[in-house]
Amino acid sequence: MTWALRRLVLAPAVVASAVLLWFTLPLWLLGAALVSPVVPGRLRVVRLAWVAVLYLTIEALLLVVLLGMWLASGFGRRIRTPYWEGIHYDLVQGVMWIFFREARRVLRLTITTDGPAPDAHPGVPIVVCCRHAGPGDSFTLVHALMHWYGREPRVVLKDTLAWDPAIDVLLNRIPARFITPGRPGEDVDKQIAALATGLDENDAFVIFPEGGNFTPQRRTRAIERLRRLGLQAMADRAERMTHVLAPKPGGLLAALDAAPEADVVLVAHTGLDHLTGVADIWRALPMDKRLTMRWWQVPRAEIPTDRDARIDWLYGWWETIDAWVAENRPEDLPPGRSR
């Protein structure tokens, strides 16, 4: 029923909304231009309006293109072959390139990377563990992996993202998993292991061990959860980390077991992580910010084989990430200040 609602109701509604938007676009732009002078921030409303137009337009075009691919692949019979999988990855990369080009141009967002060069992992599959904080960090990571590192990411996502029609259709045609943490009878670690199986030399398995975007409230709940489980030592270590959530090791351990040839790449980022709500994002627009990503490569030979040792190793790296974030804090904009 949920699948039918997303595919047969929501997806056509998005396409129809995009068509209606373009027919009425002059009115929307005129309204945005009239409101913009009384709203703090240079052309803030106009910029946001353009981002909304761009998003809805690309969403609708993607759905049309994906329908065409389904027809061209024999009504979906060949849609999961390597040929069509490669075309879908090219489509993802193209869409990410457009979005981030517009983010640079319209929102004045720049992205810098620090760490191993793109050719630091030649011919080796990688498992990528990333800090989860700030708006759109998963898309930024996918863009970086595809655009700069030439990788085809396999991503684990929360099932709520499947309500975006284009994401729903597209990621169900390439190696990815929508998971529902806590759902009875759903073995998340088993799904993660299945997705991480069979990585080749240009694949990157992507996982966010924290399980959710960082907020102070989630950090407190994660520490309390460890204490309820009797994991006092882990809770104490998590309490000393102030910029990250306590990592949940199960998914990463399952991925490491399923991909015994893979190196591990850990990723921290800062710049937008302090934007934890709609009000924060609104105050920061137009962004005029620099998002910095720090990458570390860990060769497989340096990763412990024992489960408890791996958990300790993961916590040690999360402490490194926490320290890096503390040293690279973004400068918050005062509320109401224009940029």
PLM regions and their residue ranges:
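Accessory terminal regions of nucleic-acid processing enzymes
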Residues: P304-R339
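Extracellular/periplasmic catalytic domains that process cell-envelope and extracellular macromolecules
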Residues: H121, L199-D200
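General small-molecule cofactor/ligand-binding pocket signal
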Residues: T112-D114, R177, W296
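Membrane-proximal helical "anchor" segments flanking the first transmembrane region
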Residues: M1-V127
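A Trp-anchored, charged/polar loop motif used as the substrate-binding/catalytic surface
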Residues: E186-T197
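Catalytic core of membrane glycerolipid acyltransferases/transacylases, capturing the structured
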Residues: L67-I98, R104-V106, H121-P122, I126-P184
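Short, conserved clusters of charged catalytic residues that mark active-site
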Residues: V14, I98, K190, P247-G250
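A cross-family acyltransferase "interaction/gating" segment
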Residues: R151, D159-I174, D200-D306
